Amino acid sequence: YKRPRDFCLQYGVLEEMYEEDTTEYNSTSKSRKRKVRERFLPGVSPIVYSRFLLENAVFLSLNDMGKELPDYEEIPLPCTMLPEVKKEYDALQNCFRHLMSKEPRIGKRVMSAYLNLLSAYPDQPYGHEPIRNPFVPEEDQNVLSAPKDIGSADDLQPKDEVLLDLIDRKLQEGERVIVYTAWVRLDTQERLHKLLTEKGVKAAILDQKVPTVQREEWVDKRVHEGVKVLITNSALVETGLDLNAFTTLIFYNIAFNLYVFRQASRRSWRINQTAPKVEIYMLYYADTMQHKALRLMASKLSAATVIEGQISDEGLAAMSDCQDLTTQLAKELMRGLKDDVEDLAASFKKMAIFRNHPKPAAAEKYSAPAEPEEQLLPVQQSILLPVPVSYTHLRAH
């Protein structure tokens, strides 16, 4: 208790940074290494639960309150990019891989911009700014990638078609739908509102202009006016709102924020919900950055449920994983591994909550089509120069 550092060394995650002098003359001999600094990172060893918490803690959730709750399931829906969009996406992805391999100094500086571009481009393959070399001031000489514009806001993308089809089916079943969007720089909300209006669906956009304390009243008023689809950013409803009138929640795209996702996805799964089931759909393009991000989110969600007493092997394994999603996505992209759609669906299926209505979600019609085997471009290893290098070593005790 009085030695927090010793406790963290035993049960936490420690990052140790070293400097190693390597030259071409002593590459085969023992190089000089010295510790530069160390710091503790967010993360905890699974031993903490068996040693300190299991016999001394009570985990409560809504299921334990003695109230009748609806079934709850999160369902990933894969989509397939248009061929011309996929071609440009692959070019952008390979450019980033090449940059990280050959020019890691530049790659690390533009990593966030590239990951955001690779996440947003499949949804909106137009209107993106070029990615520039931060070390070259001349704008006519510093362009690293200039995404091609394919189509416009008037063109339907495959994800749009899946979304409209799903909304149409849910409205025919008498449900109301929430559509969450996350990319604030895209015109997604206005586009979707226009598409729904043209199909005769009454929709409304909840934006940040509505004060926080008035949002629930604003939503109730729109429901009484006959609104069937609510479009909003998930960050605007993450806390404090009960949206029981909407029993189908669709994430058109997802930001890399686990807390916001968990809060927004539970807005309708409340104690006073009278519907038999609440379904959460997550739309993504298969074998893209969206796919990788969603798979990492599933792993993080599994770890988060351990805190609530829902212990699983996957959750325990992810507890000591302290890296942020951006860093993990970059590593996943460099590895070049193809994700499995069925594995992703199974990961979310494990976290579903079924009580009195144990039936599979009606999402089979959106199963991913067969795709040709991916051909990955070879990525050469970075060349070690005869200069001092720094590296990070993580150890979870």
Task: Explain the meaning of each model-derived region.
Residues 1-132, 173, 280, 294-303:
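Inter-lobe coupling linker of SF2 helicases/translocases
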Residues 202-291:
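Conserved RecA-like P-loop NTPase helicase motor core
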Residues 259, 269-344:
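A conserved SF2-helicase RecA2
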Residues 304, 313-318, 351-369:
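C-terminal helicase lobe and adjacent C-terminal extensions/tails of nucleic-acid helicase motors
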Residues 373, 377-386:
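Acidic, low-complexity intrinsically disordered tails
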Residues 389-397:
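Conserved small/polar residues in nucleotide/adenosyl-binding loops
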